[in-house]
Amino acid sequence: DIDWWYCNDILLSSSIGCVGGILTCLLSESLILISCKKKKKKSETQQAASTKKGASKLLWRGDIDWCEFTKHRSKADCWLCIAGNVYDVTKWLDRHPGGRQILLNYCGRDATDQFLAFHRQEDHRYLKLYQIGRVAPGTAPEPSKQTVAYRKLRGDLQREGLFDADLKFYIKELLIVLALLGGGIGVIASIGAVSHFTKVTIGAVLLGLGMHQAAFIGHDGLHRGITVKGAGKLFGIRDWGWKINKFLGVFCSSCIFGISSSMWTEEHSLHHSITRRPREDPQFIYLPIWLISLKELHKSVTERVGALARLEKYFMKILVPLQIYTFVPVAVLIGRTNLHIISACYAIKNFKVHDLLCQFLYWLWFVKVILAIPLLRHRVWFVFINHCVIGVLHVQLVLNHFAVECFTAEEEEGKTITRDGRGVMPWDHQQPHPTSTD
């Protein structure tokens, strides 16, 4: 009798891990909600009452001069402008689902385009609770030509339905991912007691390609870009479209790719709102290892003080001149390890249960694959090749952003970034997501 838990059949173990990952995602979406169903109406009522209570204390200020509006840009006094209306979101900072930092970055500024890009139409109803007035006519600066052109382009694309994703495309991509993962696991499972260098290499490459492609699906799912419709009910499931997005996003990014979906969502949303802003975009702060813009030096010298700042400057002098040699090795080999570390730290610090479970399942099946290889040197080779294949994704994403200029918050007004889109993107790189600033 062979206990399934101790079974050495890698295919069986991986299948169990895959099913476990799916169940974990479903549990995080459904079971926890069902267990809280009795408290749901009460908590929603309390939250609505709390929101209205906090909003009712806001003083209506009527027409607000733009110069006066721009003074309210701190944690204790945060105002936003959206479509000419002024909102006091100070009491909303800690309850904002996207995190407080993204709001703080737009205190005292026009956040119209950012709000429209990140929120559904249903979310607009919360705005009126925090409105305190309107920008006085003739006091706000006129939007730049680039901003006007961007808004017109966005409206045209929406009307033409070009933001409506094709779910069939993602089903096809998911099948490709599962085929690559299954092929890689099957090759490793066929090794047996005698390890074969060729099989180890092929298995590592196939698994790496599958994880590489899963990252793209996870990216689009966590962006809620796989099914942009589906806010109603389907088979009794409310907001089914958004649940499909989250399910595929969490499953592909956490259970297959092995990173924290919550950490990625928070950082990546902030990245898209302040793309490549020196020393502020959380996904593109690489000092003291790499310098991506001379503007980073200015912010380091003028805004950073203390022992850590001095230590950073010391290592910058040593490492930055070597970045032409360290870029590829660090991006390919260290980048993925760094993602695993910060994902685990984020999930533990913020006690994200579904993140911890999904990352546990990732390590369960991935370590099982490694242990199926008999020889230690072949295990090391497998991990090295797998990281190299996935590392191509890191190199691609970093270079994709390094190729454009950085703009500070002050410079963003009236500027835009254009990218030469000539040529055909290979299948394995899919489509790059646009990077732009107003």
Residue ranges, per PLM feature:
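B-type heme-binding environments
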Residues: 3-163
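Cytosolic juxtamembrane amphipathic/interface segments immediately preceding
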Residues: 156-167, 308-316
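Polar-ligand-bearing catalytic/cofactor-coordination segments
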Residues: 42, 52, 139-141, 150, ...
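Long, hydrophobic alpha-helical transmembrane bundles and adjoining juxtamembrane helices/loops
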Residues: 9, 21, 141-145, 149-151, ...
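Divalent metal-coordination and catalytic microenvironments
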Residues: 84, 157, 219, 268-271, ...
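Membrane-embedded catalytic scaffold of the fatty acid hydroxylase/desaturase
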Residues: 204-350, 408-438
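Transmembrane-cytosolic junction motif
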Residues: 29-38, 225, 395-406, 410
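Alpha-helical bilayer-embedded segments of polytopic membrane proteins, i.e.
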Residues: 3, 7-25, 167-214, 253-257, ...
